């Protein structure tokens, strides 16, 4: 089961964080081809702990202060995976979880802007309303990125 999540880079901790979108979100609604989406309210999106959000299907690392192990980012509107096609992000995050040298937070941010948000911006979508899908991580699959598909299907 996939869950809707917002992605945020935390430069103070040099980690990539997910912000779960709770069903109780009462932000400004956004109408699109998939229906009405709401931006998260402060109470619905917490950086501390997400147990109160009652989301199902998230791996144990989703609410970790270190961020998730690996992500599969998908445009919720067109379901087109852009980052996973290059196989860069899963390898980078895998190295970071092992404490190995990897892409810096600044480089990750540039990567997201260049490879992920660019296409969506050209389609006229608002970055602040981007919704992502978490597909899987090392808590679901026990293998190395080089020997298997790092993600489960969302």
Swiss-Prot record:
Transmembrane segments: none annotated. A fraction may be phosphorylated in insect cells and HepG2 cells, a human hepatoblastoma cell line. Phosphorylated in vitro by host protein kinase C or mitogen-activated protein kinase. N-acetylated in insect cells. InterPro entries: Transactivation_prot_X. It is found in: Host cytoplasm; Host nucleus; Host mitochondrion. It holds the Pfam family X. It comes from the Viruses. Its main location: host cell. Keywords: Activation of host NF-kappa-B by virus, Activator, Apoptosis, Host cytoplasm, Host G2/M cell cycle arrest by virus, Host mitochondrion, Host nucleus, Host-virus interaction, Modulation of host cell cycle by virus, Transcription, Transcription regulation. GO terms for biological process: DNA-templated transcription; symbiont-mediated activation of host NF-kappaB cascade; symbiont-mediated arrest of host cell cycle during G2/M transition; viral genome replication. Residues 68-117 are annotated as: Mitochondrial targeting sequence. One of its GO terms (cellular component) is host cell nucleus. Belongs to the orthohepadnavirus protein X family. May form homodimer. May interact with host CEBPA, CFLAR, CREB1, DDB1, E4F1, HBXIP, HSPD1/HSP60, NFKBIA, POLR2E and SMAD4. Interacts with host SMC5-SMC6 complex and induces its degradation. Interacts with host TRPC4AP; leading to prevent ubiquitination of TRPC4AP. Interacts with host PLSCR1; this interaction promotes ubiquitination and degradation of HBx and impairs HBx-mediated cell proliferation. Multifunctional protein that plays a role in silencing host antiviral defenses and promoting viral transcription. Does not seem to be essential for HBV infection. May be directly involved in development of cirrhosis and liver cancer (hepatocellular carcinoma). Most of cytosolic activities involve modulation of cytosolic calcium. The effect on apoptosis is controversial depending on the cell types in which the studies have been conducted. May induce apoptosis by localizing in mitochondria and causing loss of mitochondrial membrane potential. This is Protein X. The lineage of its organism: Viruses, Riboviria, Pararnavirae, Artverviricota, Revtraviricetes.
């Amino acid at each position: 089961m996939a869950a809707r999540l917002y992605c945020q880079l935390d430069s103070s901790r040099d980690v990539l964080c997910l912000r779960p979108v709770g069903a109780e979100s009462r932000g400004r609604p956004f109408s699109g081809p998939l229906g009405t989406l709401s931006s998260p309210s402060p109470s619905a999106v917490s950086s501390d702990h997400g147990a109160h959000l009652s989301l199902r299907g998230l791996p144990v690392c989703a609410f970790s202060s270190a961020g998730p192990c690996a992500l599969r980012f998908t445009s919720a509107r067109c379901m087109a995976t852009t980052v996973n096609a290059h196989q860069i992000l899963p390898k980078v995050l895998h190295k970071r979880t092992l404490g190995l040298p990897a892409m810096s937070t600044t480089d990750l941010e540039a990567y997201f802007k260049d490879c992920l948000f660019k296409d969506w911006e050209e389609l006229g979508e608002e970055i602040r309303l981007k919704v992502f899908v978490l597909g899987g991580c090392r808590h679901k699959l026990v293998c190395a990125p080089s020997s298997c598909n790092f993600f489960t299907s969302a």
